Amino acid sequence: MRAISSLAGPRALAAFGRNDIRGTYRDPLLVMLVIAPVIWTTGVALLTPLFTEMLARRYGFDLVGYYPLILTAFLLLTSIIVAGALAAFLVLDDVDAGTMTALRVTPVPLSVFFGYRAATVMVVTTIYVVATMSCSGILEPGLVSSLIPIGLVAGLSAVVTLLLILAVANNKIQGLAMVRALGMLIAGLPCLPWFISSNWNLAFGVLPPYWAAKAFWVASDHGTWWPYLVGGAVYNLAIVWVLFRRFRAKHA
């Protein structure tokens, strides 16, 4: 990343990208984060039909009605934490390599670096959401197009995850501990509103991933889901702004 000191604009962004690619394939932990969605998707595609048949045969229980919840728990919400954690570890690598210090004396402002990081997180999250849920074999037909905007809102939640990790962690060991701590908050609690039929489920809106999950559930039920996208985008952006100011103060 020393080459960044003489770069600005698009060339700096290209340098960031090359550094991310090198950093990812050299670190087994980051490689595992990249391929984890493939493993989860395979598990959902292979095991869900088996459990559906077994529960229907033995207990007369229809698991099909819970497919949106399964997709949310194993693919949508995990895409958020995987993309956010991957980006956080790459930033922590940059901190260890002195990149953040070098940025202070280059034409590249910290906002450009963060803008690149946030954009890549949103793109990666959206790709994960669309690809994994489409390949799961249990997604209701006709919902693929709705996964793109839902994936973008999930991407904003992944940016929140990135910034939460960086707000506490100063190295990858601390970052890994933060990922574990955030696991239930991101991939567990947002599933609980599924079981709450009243408007009290909106209380879970304090959790950034809730909005993408709720939008997907409503879309699966053929309801009006766009208000949850708008609300989720506004809420997540507000949190991103607050956390980014802390990030900027920490590394300015």
UniProtKB/Swiss-Prot annotation:
<keyword id="KW-0812">Transmembrane</keyword>
<dbReference type="GO" id="GO:0005886">
    <property type="term" value="C:plasma membrane"/>
</dbReference>
<comment type="subunit">
    <text>The complex is composed of 2 ATP-binding proteins (Rv2688c) and 2 transmembrane proteins (Rv2686c and Rv2687c).</text>
</comment>
<dbReference type="GO" id="GO:0055085">
    <property type="term" value="P:transmembrane transport"/>
</dbReference>
<dbReference type="GO" id="GO:0046677">
    <property type="term" value="P:response to antibiotic"/>
</dbReference>
<feature type="transmembrane region" description="Helical">
    <location>
        <begin position="148"/>
        <end position="168"/>
    </location>
</feature>
<feature type="transmembrane region" description="Helical">
    <location>
        <begin position="119"/>
        <end position="139"/>
    </location>
</feature>
<keyword id="KW-1133">Transmembrane helix</keyword>
<feature type="transmembrane region" description="Helical">
    <location>
        <begin position="31"/>
        <end position="51"/>
    </location>
</feature>
<feature type="transmembrane region" description="Helical">
    <location>
        <begin position="224"/>
        <end position="244"/>
    </location>
</feature>
<feature type="transmembrane region" description="Helical">
    <location>
        <begin position="176"/>
        <end position="196"/>
    </location>
</feature>
<dbReference type="GO" id="GO:0015562">
    <property type="term" value="F:efflux transmembrane transporter activity"/>
</dbReference>
<feature type="transmembrane region" description="Helical">
    <location>
        <begin position="69"/>
        <end position="89"/>
    </location>
</feature>
<keyword id="KW-0046">Antibiotic resistance</keyword>
<keyword id="KW-1003">Cell membrane</keyword>
<keyword id="KW-0813">Transport</keyword>
<protein>
    <recommendedName>
        <fullName>Fluoroquinolones export permease protein Rv2686c</fullName>
    </recommendedName>
</protein>
<keyword id="KW-0472">Membrane</keyword>
<comment type="function">
    <text>Part of the ABC transporter complex Rv2686c/Rv2687c/Rv2688c involved in fluoroquinolones export. Confers resistance to ciprofloxacin and, to a lesser extent, norfloxacin, moxifloxacin and sparfloxacin. Probably responsible for the translocation of the substrate across the membrane.</text>
</comment>
